[in-house]
Every structure is written in C-alpha cells, then in structure tokens.
Amino acid sequence: MTRYVLGRIGQAVVVLWAAYTLTFAILYLLPSDPMELQLAAAGVQPDSLSAGQVAAIKHQFGLDQPIWLQYWHHLSGLLRGDFGTSLTQQVPVSDLLAQRIGPTLLLSVSAALVSLVAGSALAYLATFTRWTVLTRLPAVGASFPQFFIALFLIQFFSFQLGWFPATGGLVLPVITISVLASSVLAQVLIKSFEETLSQPYVVTARAKGLSRSAVHVRHAFRNAALPAMTILGVIVGLTVTSSIVVETVFTREGVGKLAQEAVLSQDVPVVLAVVTVAAAIFVLVNLVVDLLYPLLDPRIAVSGAAR
C-alpha cells in the first residue's frame, strides 16, 4: 500500500512538472516578442526607444538571459510560492489570481456538482428504463462544442426568452459546462451499470425475488459507481479547462478570461501561474481519487501489495 501511495504521489509531481515545462516551452516558441507586446499594452512604440532603453527593459524583466536560466528563475520562484510579476499589468501575479479565482471556483464547483447529479441520474434512468433515447442522449450531449452550446443558450434564454443575462451570469455558464461533463460521466456509468447487472450476484438477487429497483439500488449502483470514480478527475478537469472558453463567451471576470488575456499579450508569468494552478487542481483531485479507490475496492490494495 505504501508503494502504491508513493507511486501515485510521484506521478502527480511528474505531471505537474511536465505541464509547467511544456507551457513554458510553447510560450517561448511563439514568434512574437514579450517585450514588444508589453510596450504596446503601455502605448509605447518599440521603435521610439533607444537601444539602451530596450536593453534596460529586457534586463529588468530578465528577458536578456538565456532561456534555460529564465526557466530556472520561474521554476524556483514557483517552488517558493512566488508567481512573479505580470509583464503587462506590473502587479504580482498572485494578486491577479486572488482577484479572479473566486468567480472561477464558484463556476467550476457549481458545474461539477450539477454534472455529477445530472450524469448519475441520466445513467440510472437510461439503465433502469432501457429507453433508447436516454441511452443515446449522452453521446449527443458530448458531441456538441461548448461554444456552440453557449451561443445557443444565449440566443434562446437571453435574447428570445429574456430569462437570464447574456453576460456575467452564472446559470447559463454552469449549464454550458455541465452538458459535456455530465454526458461523459453518464456514458461511463451506463457502461458500468450494464457490466454490473450481468454479474452473478445480481442474477442471484433477482432469482431471490428482489424487485428491479431493489437490485439496482442495493447491489448494482454502489458497485457500478466504483469504476466511475476514476473519471471524477476528468470531470473536474473538464470544468476547470472549460471555464476558459465559457468565461470568454459569457464575459465573466474569472481566471479563464485572465488566461485568455495573458496568452494574447504573451504575459508569460500569468500564463504559467494559471496553467500551474489548473494542473495542480486536476492532479490533486486525481490523486485523492487514486488514494481513496483502494479503500473502497480492497482488490486494488491487494494487487498493489502483490507487486
């Protein structure tokens, strides 16, 4: 069990490091110059500065250093809890995150809860009723791009019915994210339900005279939900990453919109901070699920100990 736990923690650290390093490499492979974008954001033309002034600005932000040294400075600062200073806004990145993370957490948590409830309910109803429409509905929901769902909801519920605001609201963004996340969860649960209902202990329970609902609730649901736990991390990842698109479409002042603005201006410290926080949330949830799974299914712990 100890080896299993240490292995999962080691994998989590590697994933975080890989996400950070890959993001850093992509940002520095972009053809644009971060300093020029920073000056443009301040309304200054780079051609109006002397070579000495340009060199001083690059030195101030460490842009004149070799790329490996810039990488090390960013990484060592992150390990100390220092995300650095925004190149375009000249404020600590941690302050920007603190200002924007509240709306994003509210959106992500709300969407995750709605997705869990809706996905589980849809999977149970589809399995219990065996209605073809319900069985195929998750595949339909997972096939639509989120920006299309967002624009459809705005057009119908905001412009035509006038029930919800087109920008800055919470209900429509939550629905937009939940359609995809709940559809993915429902697909996994339906497959798990079908496999569980064919197990010998379920057949025996039916032979003893238990009703279909009793068999589903007492025997099938708990065992079918165990494999679906592994997808909880994916659901959380979907809700976090989806916030970038959703907050942009609905003009919500959250971390997602901050990330979009930072990418467009090539604000490296901000982008690295957002990616690191998002990856940390994703990795942490998956790590918790991995550590809880052996407690709920002792076979995992036994197989891990055997190896």
Model-found features: residue ranges?
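An internal, D/E-rich "acidic patch" concept
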Residues: 62-120
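Hydrophobic alpha-helical transmembrane segments of membrane transport/permease proteins
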Residues: 16-69, 162-170
